[in-house]
Amino acid sequence: MRQNFFCIILAITQGIHTMTEFSTPDTEQIKSHGLTPDIVAQQLADFVRGFPYANITRPATVGDGITELSDPDIARYTEKYIAAQKTKKIVKFVPASGAATRMFRDLFEFLNTGTENDTTRRVLDNLDKFAFWDDLRQFLPATPTDRDKIACILTDAGLNYGNLPKGLIAFHKYDTYSRTALEEHLAEGAQYATANGTVHIHFTVSPEHLAGFRALLARTVPEYSARYGVNYDITMSNQRTSTDTIAVNPDNTPFRTDDGHLLFRPAGHGALIENLNDIDADIVFIKNIDNVTTDKLRGDTIKYKRALAGLLVCLQSRAFEYLNNFTAHDLNEIRTFITNDLCVRVPDDASADTLRQILNRPIRVCGMVKNIGAPGGGPFWVRDENGTESLQIIESSQIAPDARDIMNASSHFNPVDLVCGTRDAHGNKFDLGRFIDPQTGFISDKSYGGRNLRAMERPGLWNGAMAHWNTVFVAVPASTFTPAKVVTDLLSPSHGAK
């Protein structure tokens, strides 16, 4: 008879003692995720302790943390970027994991309950305006009911969109064909992310959708390569199970499934910092899979992507010059650059070593859109325990109730429009794991099999996972932010609907 050994872990974190017993099967399950009992015990301690609120001091606004580019600025930075395209490796990084379930939530409600809602009615009244109409009608019976139409959109009786990721959904209708969100990224990448004639695009994809992405790419890449006169280098990766976090009961004890197993959950987009860390590039553009528009409306996107990248190149160039010739420069000159250009405000007594350390970080230039009621995090000034103020993208869940007035005064929001420099002054890749603030995770209430649980997300990719980067915010027009969060967004003018 096999002996059932127990691994007992004592996690001691900021005065919190958590004794956790893991059985041999538990330990084997933990290791199968690429985790260790110590890591899981630390996660359990984090549930007990919670995560502190961000110490926001004020919102970033134009003139105080957000730069507004003039036409001469845009021209100058664009010229810098075009020059960099000749010598730099450029990658477009597109988070594209997960099914589009939320995009079709109201349609699922109608399908499951028969209760019509405004979204469903609008979809049914405008079916022929969607890019997927020609594909959809091939599945419809001769005299389809409303339920037939919705079922053929969502289920494998038709398009099966309810089980597909957004990247594989037809977003835009052109004169003789339609394009998926993935195809729009191919087109977009060819227009600003080329380097020596090649477009490098990396998609993060769920394992169950890899085959679908590969099939679509095999059909479309040759077409777009010929259309734009470029070569494509497309790579894909999965969110690693080693970034999963354990789920707990409401009393913070490990949640177990009906068969007694521990439950691990994907830890949110912050886990993708490991995928980003694997990217070998000088310049990385980051943009979500659903934030695309049509060829005719893409002008502002191309214009500002180039300008933001050129600004990044200029900031890197100066930071590298200071690092490589640190003693040759006056410390006040370096401090002024750090304060005015890198937007890091250090205490007056900050040492030369502190200034050098600040220069030696990854840099990101982030577009910020004026508030129009869209969801998403916002740009804020945040003060750390050493008194240093820097710019951060902060989610509402990170803001204390008594700081809501500061949050409500925010003028801009985060559209996830990042241009990143991940090499150091010697051309070596930074280890991005060194620049995460582990105390910026999220805990939320979820359910599994009808039972309540608590889930933990790692620090968000553009939030705590980049907390110790140098961050610069630039105002960009709302025309660069055209996501499809719900299916009826595809009927908006920004998606080419007429």
Predicted regions and their residues:
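Short linear interaction motif-like sites in intrinsically disordered regions of transcription factors
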Residues: 2-3, 134
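Primarily single-stranded nucleic-acid-binding OB-fold modules
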Residues: 342-364, 373-382, 388-394, 403-498
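Domain-scale recognition of functional cores that engage charged ligands
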Residues: 30-31, 56-372, 381-401, 458, ...
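N-terminal regions that are enriched for targeting/export leaders
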Residues: 20-62, 76
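Short, Lys/Arg-enriched N-terminal segments with co-localized hydrophobic residues
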Residues: 3-18
